[in-house]
Curated annotation (Swiss-Prot):
Keywords, in A-Z order: DNA damage, DNA repair, Endonuclease, Hydrolase, Metal-binding, Nuclease, Zinc
Major enzyme class: hydrolase
Molecular-function GO terms, alphabetical: deoxyribonuclease IV (phage-T4-induced) activity; DNA binding; DNA-(apurinic or apyrimidinic site) endonuclease activity; phosphoric diester hydrolase activity; zinc ion binding
Lineage, uppermost ranks: Bacteria, Bacillati, Bacillota, Bacilli, Bacillales
EC number: 3.1.21.2
Keyword Metal-binding attributed: yes
Protein known as: Probable endonuclease 4
Function: Endonuclease IV plays a role in DNA repair. It cleaves phosphodiester bonds at apurinic or apyrimidinic (AP) sites, generating a 3'-hydroxyl group and a 5'-terminal sugar phosphate.
Length: 298
């Protein structure tokens, strides 16, 4: 079975149940959530996440595994502000606890961090320090380090940087990788013409067994732009053919594929989610040039 889904919202009273219902409405077989708003630290207590009803709904609809994304505000790469680093460490610990409580997620996707001017090496050392403070040998969920586009002072823009972080962490069996197609493309990897070559390079430097999550996004920018702006499937510089190849790659059949493509529409208050039609299109093997119009008409 193809494990494919998108980012969905976990909110209101229904929480995990609402997320599962949204995912199922898209024809998804997995999904990704934030356990609260990605841009702040406000979180509902675990008892209010409606876990039991959510898990039951998932089971009824054949969804076995989901992904959690850590909030953007976590930056364990910060060497200049001890309070920012500490917030990141404390909050990551809390996210591990919350994700464990869900019982259906094995991976927490984390943007490794930004060095905020101290240099990549200093940032990487700080990320290692933070992860060493957070990870324990008995935790049941992994931290999936996301491949980054290289925007600003982001660490993790190359496979070498990801490998350096992993190598420095004591309990690194608790680390995996989330491979983001838009980010890797924007960082300069040729996933359009030579994805197999890129995957081989990843295997040599990091190890393909670490690749446990895929973010499937097209890119608004040319390869190597270092920008990180997602585009709808087939409408960017990566293109449908390359993304379809990645989604159906024989070495990655077990890996959940998560779409984070933009909502569609000119009216900011009435943008439509693209995921149902994008998932269908990635399953059926044919690019639909009229997709965006169909999404708007939903």
């Amino acid at each position: 079975m193809l494990k494919i889904g998108s980012h969905v919202s976990m909110s209101g009273k229904k929480m995990l149940l609402a997320a599962s219902e949204e995912a199922v409405s898209y024809g998804a077989t997995t999904f990704m959530i934030y356990t609260g708003a990605p841009q702040n630290t406000r979180r509902k207590p675990i008892e209010e996440l409606n876990i039991e009803a959510g898990r039951k709904h998932m089971e009824q609809n054949g969804i076995e595994e989901i992904i959690v994304h850590a909030p953007y505000i976590i930056n364990v790469g910060n060497t200049t502000k001890p309070e920012t680093f500490q917030l990141g460490v404390d909050f990551l610990r809390m996210e591990i606890e919350r994700t464990s409580a869900l019982g259906v997620a094995k991976q927490i996707v984390l943007h490794p961090g930004a060095h905020v001017g101290a240099g990549a090496d200093a940032g990487i050392q700080q990320i290692i320090k933070g992860l060493n403070e957070v990870l324990t040998p008995d935790q049941t969920v992994n931290i999936a380090l996301e491949t980054m586009a290289g925007k600003g002072t982001e660490c993790g823009r190359s496979f070498e940087e990801i490998a350096k972080i992993i190598d420095g962490v004591k309990y690194n069996e608790k680390l995996s990788v989330c491979f983001d197609t838009c980010h890797t493309h924007d960082a300069g990897y040729d996933i359009v013409n030579d994805f197999d070559g890129v995957l081989n390079e990843f295997d040599k430097i990091v190890g393909i067994d670490r690749l446990q999550v895929l973010h499937i996004n097209d890119s608004k920018n040319v390869r190597g732009a270092g920008k990180d702006r997602h585009e709808n499937i087939g409408f960017g510089h990566i293109g449908y053919k390359a993304l379809h190849h990645i989604v159906h790659h024989p070495q990655l059949t077990h890996v959940p594929k998560i779409l984070e493509t933009p909502y569609v529409g000119e009216d900011k208050k009435d943008k439509k989610p693209p995921y149902k039609l994008e998932i269908e299109m990635l399953k059926n093997g044919t690019f639909d040039e009229g997709l965006l119009e169909k999404i708007k008409a939903q």
